[in-house]
Amino acid sequence: MGLLEVDQLSFAYGVIEAVKDLSFSVSRGEVFGLLGPNGSGKSTVVRLLSRVLTPHGGRVSFAGRDLGTYSREELARQIAVVPQETAIELPFSVLEVVLMGRSPHLGRFGFERAEDLAVAHRVMEQTGVSELATREIHELSGGERQRVILARALAQQPRMLLLDEPTAFLDIKHQVEVYDLIKALSRQNGLTVVAILHDLNLAALYCDRLALLKSGHRFCLGTPEQVLTYTNIKAVYETEVYIGLNDLTGKVHILPLDAATRQRLEAERQDRG
């Protein structure tokens, strides 16, 4: 039994079905990726797993317990969320924002203790935002803000991290650093991660298993090598790609093809057929 169990999950926005009979499980310490084109239901799944939305059908259990039975405070000690965008308009410093992640662990009077500050400084160091500690959050770039929000989530010391395209605003250096950190925490601390990714190469490099979604359904589930095939990508994303093997990492590598190359390939197929 996985730490997270999703069984026949369904949800609709009015008459539009966003998630349909979705099932998967995620084990402790696993990095699990959710893939699919825009509108495939990925963000809705994360909202359901974080209880922002309530399922219309099916069941989600965490650590053997129905997700709906957790209090908000209990859930915040178990699961942290890093959304794609976070609006913080008040002039909080970076340290103050990160310390917000300690709220589920504070005593009845809500004052930070020395251990809370120690956790905050540690995760700020891990995410590379220590030097920004006294800066106000609204002064930061999009990429800097996103690393602060990740630090806030890690300050919760959750058992599971839900990530909605967490590196969308980051340059390639910081993308790799964030995923290196997430992978290390999963291996060393048993942190379970469910992440939405649009970059198929990052998914292949860092995820243990993937679920590929299409129109709210689970199209396929498995290792990156099993999921990221030409046939699957063509069927779900409706585009031509080149798939090879990265000699350095041993991982699947996906390259999109431009219009001229796609037209040439189609002409070659017609000539053969």
Residue ranges and their predicted role:
Residues 35-37:
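The feature captures the beta-strand-to-loop junction immediately N-terminal to the Walker
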Residues 50:
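Helix-to-loop junction immediately C-terminal to a conserved catalytic motif
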Residues 58-66, 75:
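Conserved ABC transporter NBD signature motif
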Residues 99, 114-132, 157:
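Conserved ABC ATPase "signature" region
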Residues 110, 136-140, 144:
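Conserved ABC ATPase signature
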Residues 161-165:
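Catalytic Walker B motif of ABC-type/P-loop ATPase nucleotide-binding domains
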Residues 236-273:
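ABC ATPase nucleotide-binding domains
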